[in-house]
């Protein structure tokens, strides 16, 4: 098994792996500073299958991480509650995850990385086209999760 130079595959959460937007009244709940939508979000993928693939990628030298935003205009206290809820969701649903980065809403995601993404060509999987474009402008690789995520990830080891 040939290991690659360590690179990180980062996942966004909301709308990428967690179905925040599919919940009834999610926006009203966020505006009311409730964490229920984050706690109750259903996975958007078969997480057993996804985690199996991610653990295989780890054997090839990839690290797995999450970079996720809080809610727009959230207070400090609400951001803390969101962070806690999202971390629990990741622990319950994405055990392959090795890094967790929580950012206030709108923070450029490349600012969460420990290294300069231009060096390692770290990968971001995000449903937001604008976020993917910004990531790529900083030298990273971006994947649209709506375009056969399993196939895209499997190609990283073939």
Where are the language model's segments positioned?
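Short amphipathic alpha-helix with an adjacent loop that forms part of the alpha/beta core around
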Residues: 1-2, 111-118, 152-158
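Intrinsically disordered, low-complexity terminal extensions
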Residues: 55-63, 149, 153-158
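Alpha-helical substrate-recognition element adjacent to the catalytic core
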Residues: 2-89
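Conserved beta-strand segments of alpha/beta enzyme cores
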Residues: 63, 98-101, 141
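Structural recognition of alpha->loop->beta junctions
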Residues: 86-102
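Acidic, Mg2+-coordinating phosphoryl-transfer loop and its flanking beta/alpha structural elements
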Residues: 120-156
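Conserved Lys-Pro-Asp/Glu-containing loop-to-beta segment of HAD-superfamily phosphomonoesterases
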Residues: 8, 102-130, 135
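Acidic carboxylate-rich catalytic motifs and surrounding loops in phosphoryl-/glycosyl-chemistry enzymes
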Residues: 67-73, 100-110, 147
């Amino acid at each position: 098994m040939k290991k690659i130079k360590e690179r990180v595959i980062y996942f966004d959460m909301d709308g990428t792996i967690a179905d925040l937007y599919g919940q009834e009244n999610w926006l009203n709940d966020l505006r009311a500073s409730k964490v229920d939508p984050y706690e109750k979000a259903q996975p958007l993928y078969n997480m057993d299958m996804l985690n199996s693939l991610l653990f295989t990628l780890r054997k090839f030298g990839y690290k797995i991480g999450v970079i996720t935003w809080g809610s727009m205009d959230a207070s400090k206290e609400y951001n803390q509650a969101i962070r806690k809820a999202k971390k629990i969701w990741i622990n319950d649903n994405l055990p392959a995850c090795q890094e967790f980065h929580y950012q206030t809403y709108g923070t450029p995601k490349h600012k969460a990385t420990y290294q300069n993404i231009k060096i390692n060509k770290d990968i971001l999987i995000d449903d937001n086209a604008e976020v993917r474009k910004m990531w790529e402008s900083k030298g990273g690789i971006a994947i649209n999760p709506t375009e056969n995520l399993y196939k895209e990830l499997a190609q990283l080891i073939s």
